[in-house]
Structure formats: C-alpha cells, structure tokens
Amino acid sequence: MARRNKAKKRTSPDSRYGSVLLMRFINIIMKCGKKSIAEKIAYSALSLAEKKIGKDALSIFETAVENVTPSIEVRSRRIGGATYQVPVEIRQDRAISLALRWIARATSAARKKSGRTTVYCLQSEILDAYNKCGGAFKMCEEKYKMAEANKAFSHLRF
C-alpha cells in the first residue's frame, strides 16, 4: 500500500552539543558502524577548532557548513537527442547533505595527501570552510561555476 506522505527522517541530536546537524555529520564520517570513534574524531576536531578561534565549537561548525552549502546545481536533461546541463535550485535538506559530504570528502583527501591524522585534517577543513577557503568550499564554487556557465538552459527546467 502506498504512503500518503513521505516518511520523516528521524535523526536524534548528538550527546555533547544537542545538534542534529552535528549528528548527521558524525553519521557521514562513520565507517563500518563505529559511531563512537566517529564521535571522538568530530568532537576532538571541534574542540581544537574552538581553541584556535576562541568561539563556540557548534557555532564554528554551523557557520562552516553554511558557507559550503550550495543553493543551485546542474541536472542533466535530455531533449531531442541532446543532453543539456540545466541549473536548478536545491532543496535545503539536499544542500546540507552535500555540504556535509564535501567536508568529509575533503578531509579524507587531505588525510591521504598529507598523512596527518583525521582529527587534524577535519579541524583544518572546518576552519577552512569557516574562512571560505579549502577543498569543500572549492567544490561549492565549482557547482556555482557550472550553473553560471549553463545559465542559458535555465528555461528547460524540470
């Protein structure tokens, strides 16, 4: 039997800061179901960032995610044998998910490149996103550049 409405996501807030956003991020960086290790990594990185800047760790994290969150993306649309990249607005939930994934991916890339610990790389990536630079912010800028380049096809919206 079909649902009338889409089921709401039930993400509980994290234990230390009471933030649903931070728990979503912990779930993204978690590997092989080891949530306690993912929590240690996230909390350690946030406490290092808090010491470095001097502001509340949760506000630093929320600002970093906000700076990396895209508002537009391109989707492929096939019309008459040709495929066009059509810029469309993103739902808020998907935009935040993209931002969190980009921060995690940039952290992983920095860790492989530099050989430093995950905590240090995550802390530096959060601070980079907070200061509007770094790998995750670069991914966000690439989304905007693609949308800007394909602005002519915006009339082909879904």
Swiss-Prot record:
One GO CC term on file: small ribosomal subunit
A single MF term (Gene Ontology): structural constituent of ribosome
Residue ranges crossing the lipid bilayer per the database entry: none
HAMAP family in alphabetical order: Ribosomal_uS7_B (MF_00480_B)
Job of this protein: One of the primary rRNA binding proteins, it binds directly to 16S rRNA where it nucleates assembly of the head domain of the 30S subunit. Is located at the subunit interface close to the decoding center, probably blocks exit of the E-site tRNA.
Similarity section: Belongs to the universal ribosomal protein uS7 family.
Name this polypeptide is given: Small ribosomal subunit protein uS7
Organism: Wolbachia pipientis subsp. Culex pipiens (strain wPip)
Gene this protein is translated from: rpsG
